Amino acid sequence: MARYRGPRVKIVRRLGELPGLTTKIPNRNYPAGQHGPSSGMTKMSQYRVRLQEKQKLRYNYGVSEKQLLSYVRRARRMKGPTGELLLQMLEMRLDAVVYRLGFAPTIRAARQYVSHGLVTVNGQAVTIPSYQCSVGEVIKSNSAPIVEHAKTFGGVVPSHLSVDKNNATGKVERNVTRSQIGLTVNELLIIEFYSRK
């Protein structure tokens, strides 16, 4: 299955705030659908809780099920806490770094900027949104929309990144830690969800 292209506010209403998916804010605070307002009365199963946590991660970072499973398997092979390593790998993707630097309003927009060749890494054009950024790499763009958004960006840039808003240039200073990730998700439930795969 390809990336999700459907209504984004519906997903936000169901799963909660996803800053990488959309900047829109839903008018209603209950899930969409015929049984939306009354669905809060039912007890959520253990499977549903884990599935929703996984879906939060998928929709926020715009990755497919196959990609997320690949990231989980790669995180399992690495030394350290699997959940934190998974989030670190997702957060160090080029599209996520471009979004965190304030060059794009959402990760989806950052993905499009990268795939259209508007972003360079260490002076080389990179058109792969899943490119894993490493410490010391410089991300730059000369595109007018990106430079304009970077200048007007009012959000907080995480401390593992440094940014020059006037030149639309950013640098990865160090690896991201769990406290610097702006997504409220329980990564242990995601690892438990994938424990049988």
UniProtKB/Swiss-Prot annotation:
Pfam families: Ribosomal_S4, S4. Keywords: Chloroplast, Plastid, Ribonucleoprotein, Ribosomal protein, RNA-binding, rRNA-binding. It is found in: Plastid, Chloroplast. GO terms for cellular component: chloroplast; small ribosomal subunit. One of its GO terms (biological process) is ribosomal small subunit biogenesis. Residues 92-153 form the S4 RNA-binding domain. It comes from the Eukaryota. GO terms for molecular function: rRNA binding; structural constituent of ribosome. CDD domains: S4. Gene3D superfamilies: Ribosomal Protein S4 Delta 41, Chain A, domain 1, RNA-binding S4 domain. Its main location: plastid. SUPFAM superfamilies: Alpha-L RNA-binding motif (SSF55174). One of the primary rRNA binding proteins, it binds directly to 16S rRNA where it nucleates assembly of the body of the 30S subunit. Belongs to the universal ribosomal protein uS4 family. Part of the 30S ribosomal subunit. Contacts protein S5. The interaction surface between S4 and S5 is involved in control of translational fidelity. NCBIfam families: PRK05327.1, rpsD_bact. This is Small ribosomal subunit protein uS4c. The lineage of its organism: Eukaryota, Viridiplantae, Chlorophyta, Mamiellophyceae, Mamiellales.
